[in-house]
A protein has these predicted regions:
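N-terminal beta1-alpha1-beta2 module of alpha/beta enzyme domains
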Residues: 1-70, 176, 265, 269, ...
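Hydrophobic faces of well-ordered beta-strands that scaffold small-molecule active sites
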Residues: 3-7, 38-40, 75-79, 106-110, ...
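An alpha-helical appendage that flanks or caps ligand/catalytic pockets
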Residues: 7, 29-31, 36, 130-174, ...
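Active-site-proximal loop/turn and secondary-structure-junction residues that shape catalytic pockets
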Residues: 9, 44-45, 82, 112-116, ...
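Short, acidic/polar
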Residues: 17-30, 91-94, 181-194, 242-255, ...
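Glycine-enriched alpha-helix->loop->beta-strand junction motifs that scaffold or abut catalytic
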Residues: 34, 70-73, 102, 191-199, ...
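Internal, glycine-rich beta/alpha segment that forms the wall or movable "lid"
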Residues: 50-51, 78, 84-195, 210-222, ...
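Structural motif corresponding to the early beta-alpha repeats
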Residues: 65, 69-87
Length: 286
């Protein structure tokens, strides 16, 4: 099992004025602990389940650039980008830019977006769910076309691009790592089967999302995709009461049903080094 650190909270004991040095120290410690992936949320307000919306939150792609400058080996991406927050060609270019500047370490995690409160508050359009999924599929198509050698026009129902030029191309070939987050059985997992390198599923109360994997397998059969070509990743939440042994045991259970990577995030922990300590302990337990 490969462990990732998912940073979902920037309200740390060190305070907002010290976020830069604290974040740099946090990601360096994570990499030194053997953590192979580092991700951030793509939100502008804190999520209600993790803290008050007024708590500190940093923009994802500027933050990934900062993290890339303070790490050397870890793979980096948003977990996950809301499709409605950026024009797809801008998103593709942002990921390409970070991929090049990081030496091929930055990928794209993306989903259909859901946070209506945040969108209404900041003036982002929040279309109905069916349109958000249409935007998601077209965004996936645009990104993959821009990350290829094609400069042909793109004609979608929502987006039209006259020339999909993206120079320089990403270092990662054939394209940056592409993960789709969410477990929606009709649309999300179908898009995973069609376009993605990886899926990302939540773990609720220790229950393994094995049914979602069965659904993904059926979608792969429908579209002619090799199910084993898709990486299966999961989320693990830890609290102040969590132990390295507990995390390692849950990760072992996930590995037993086909997951190869897990992203660990904190709930109610205001000292980021405590999160790294738990993950380090889980890694040491194998």
């Amino acid at each position: 099992m490969e462990y990732g650190l998912h940073i979902a909270d920037f309200t740390w004991r060190s305070g907002a004025a010290n976020l830069g040095p604290a974040l740099a120290r946090h990601v360096r410690n994570a990499e030194a602990a053997g953590i192979r992936r580092i991700t951030v949320m793509d939100h502008f307000w804190q999520l209600p389940g993790l803290g008050p919306v007024e708590h500190e939150m940093l923009e994802a792609y500027a933050t990934l650039g900062f993290i890339a400058a303070h790490t050397e080996k870890a793979m980096l991406h948003a977990l996950v980008s809301g499709v409605i927050y950026r024009h797809p060609s801008l998103l593709a270019k942002q990921v390409t830019t970070l991929n090049v500047l990081s030496g091929g370490r930055v990928g794209l995690g993306i989903g259909a977006a859901w946070n209506e409160q945040e969108c209404r508050g900041l003036g982002f359009p929040f279309p109905p769910v069916a349109q958000r999924f249409r935007e998601l599929e077209e965004t996936l198509q645009i990104c993959l076309q821009m990350w290829s050698d094609s400069e042909q026009p793109y004609e979608g129902a929502i987006w039209q691009l006259e020339r999909t030029l993206d120079s320089p191309q990403s270092i990662s070939r054939p394209h940056p790592y592409l993960l789709i987050g969410g477990g929606g059985e009709k649309k999300t997992l179908r898009l995973v089967a069609q376009y993605a390198d990886a899926c990302n599923l939540g773990v609720s109360g220790g229950d393994l999302p094995t049914h979602k994997l069965d659904v993904l397998r059926r979608h792969c059969e429908d579209v002619g995709r090799d199910y084993d070509d898709i990486e299966k990743t999961a989320m693990i939440a830890i609290t102040p009461e969590s132990t390295a042994t507990g995390v390692a045991e849950l990760a072992e259970s996930l590995a037993g049903v086909g997951f190869t990577a897990t992203y660990v995030y904190a709930v109610g922990i205001d000292e980021p080094e405590c999160v790294v300590d738990v993950i380090r302990g889980a890694i040491e337990r194998g």
